[in-house]
């Protein structure tokens, strides 16, 4: 039966036909991902199954509240999805309570702040310039505006976290919350040391494991538990799920406060299609293959860092224990912004990044940040990452010798090698 208000193609017309302009953008992005080497440390490549869940009818359902206690009817099936995500996450990380509703890592952090501290309270987090995250008290961020944010950094001599400084600042300022973790920390964090410092001053300890959660889940990195009172993470990055956030704890009291902070505190209806995709990703991470993946991510990062150092570049802290590294470009006399663009023209994607004690502006930088999660998902091993390291050195050396305007021949030659490498490891062949 036809109704005048009904769009005949609404339930049947493909995206390519219904919105060719947007479809062209998606097709272009698929081509970019297939044809370029992705080295942005915070990015990964999800499975076909994760994409199916995120693009499912779960997107239609509003579900304010929590499983079994919703403010809307018709939530039976989304309750199943959220419960699966929670139970799988608890199994993955060996913790008692999980909230999978945060829409992002930033909102997960905001949820912890809402739950455990008040505006004006003192927090102690890592400064952005040393590898911290905006949400750990950086001045432009809400966390830096609402709280008395004290910042710790790294040691000049080895760029490692300055635990003595953390302890001294904690004793001086008596923070309510200490935050461990960041966005550009290439070495494992001593959670036990942070716990001891927190206990000494009566602070709660939050670990932001957004970058390395997948390594924890895969047994390739120490867990923040039992040391952390609460942990936050994104669900993408090394965990290889959809873009989103999550909060984990072993404390029933903290869990109750976190649940109230997320809903109704800072969010309304959760994104049930994303939570369904989280459940899929967590199920994948419970498989034996994921343990092998996590171990390979670290091996690949170490191989890449080693090859870059052989090529005359410096690696901050002298290497990596994780999925990421900070490359100090100063030995070659080039800047991070120019290097990011030159590598991009050669189809190697990364991001400019400040290094500790960087003399350059954040828009320029003396370094780039590189990571191995996406390339490892694609199938690259240590041999491929050593080849990638040599290609990076080739572009950087060309940039140093020829300048930005004169490096086209080098970049084109490397782009051809990138194309050959990517062709050996195809992505999404059925899309």
Curated annotation (Swiss-Prot):
Molecular-function GO terms, alphabetical: glycine hydroxymethyltransferase activity; pyridoxal phosphate binding
Protein name: Serine hydroxymethyltransferase
Pfam families reported for this sequence: SHMT (PF00464)
Pathway noted in the entry: One-carbon metabolism; tetrahydrofolate interconversion; Amino-acid biosynthesis; glycine biosynthesis; glycine from L-serine: step 1/1
One Gene Ontology CC term in the entry: cytosol
UniProt site (Plays an important role in substrate specificity): 236
Locations listed in the record: Cytoplasm
E.C. no: 2.1.2.1
Family statement drawn from the similarity comment of this UniProt entry: Belongs to the SHMT family.
Reactions it catalyzes: (6R)-5,10-methylene-5,6,7,8-tetrahydrofolate + glycine + H2O = (6S)-5,6,7,8-tetrahydrofolate + L-serine
GO process terms (BP): glycine biosynthetic process from serine; tetrahydrofolate interconversion
Assembly with partners or alone: Homodimer.
């Amino acid at each position: 039966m036809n109704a005048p208000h009904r769009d005949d193609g609404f339930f049947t017309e493909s995206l390519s036909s219904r919105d060719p302009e947007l479809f062209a953008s998606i097709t272009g992005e698929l081509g970019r991902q297939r044809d370029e080497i992705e080295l942005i440390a915070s990015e990964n490549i999800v499975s076909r199954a994760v994409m199916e869940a995120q693009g499912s009818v779960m997107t239609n359902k509003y579900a304010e509240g929590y499983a079994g206690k919703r403010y809307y009817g018709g939530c039976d099936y989304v309750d199943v999805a959220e419960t699966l995500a929670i139970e799988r996450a608890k199994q993955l990380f060996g913790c008692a309570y999980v909230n999978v509703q945060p829409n992002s890592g930033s909102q997960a952090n905001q949820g912890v702040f809402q739950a455990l501290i008040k505006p004006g309270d003192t927090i102690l987090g890592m400064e952005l310039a040393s590898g911290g995250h905006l949400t750990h008290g950086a001045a432009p961020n809400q966390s830096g505006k609402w709280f008395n944010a004290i910042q710790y950094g790294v040691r000049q001599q080895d760029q490692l976290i300055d635990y003595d400084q953390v302890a001294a600042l904690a004793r001086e300022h008596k923070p309510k919350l200490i935050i461990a973790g960041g966005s550009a920390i290439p070495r494992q964090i001593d959670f036990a040391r942070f716990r001891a410092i927190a206990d000494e001053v009566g602070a709660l300890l939050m670990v932001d494991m957004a970058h390395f959660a997948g390594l924890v889940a895969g047994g390739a990195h120490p867990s923040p538990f039992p040391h952390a009172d609460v942990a936050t993470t994104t669900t993408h990055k090394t965990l290889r799920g959809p873009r989103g956030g999550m909060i984990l704890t072993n404390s029933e009291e903290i869990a109750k406060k976190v649940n109230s902070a997320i809903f109704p505190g800072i969010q309304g209806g959760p994104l049930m299609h994303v939570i369904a995709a989280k459940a899929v990703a967590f199920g994948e991470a419970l498989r034996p293959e994921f343990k092998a993946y996590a171990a390979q991510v670290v091996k690949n990062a170490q191989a890449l860092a080693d090859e870059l150092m052989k090529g005359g570049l410096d690696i901050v802290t002298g290497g990596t224990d994780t999925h990421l590294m900070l490359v100090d470009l100063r030995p070659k006399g080039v800047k991070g912004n120019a290097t990011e663009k030159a590598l991009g023209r050669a189809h190697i994607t990364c991001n400019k990044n400040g290094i500790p004690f960087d003399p350059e502006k954040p828009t320029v930088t003396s370094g780039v940040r590189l990571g191995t999660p996406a390339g490892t998902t694609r199938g690259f091993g240590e041999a491929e990452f050593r080849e990638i390291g040599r290609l990076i050195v080739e572009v950087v050396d060309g940039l140093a010798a020829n300048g930005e305007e004169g490096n086209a021949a080098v970049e084109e030659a490397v782009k051809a090698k990138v194309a050959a490498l990517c062709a050996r490891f195809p992505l999404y062949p059925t899309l």
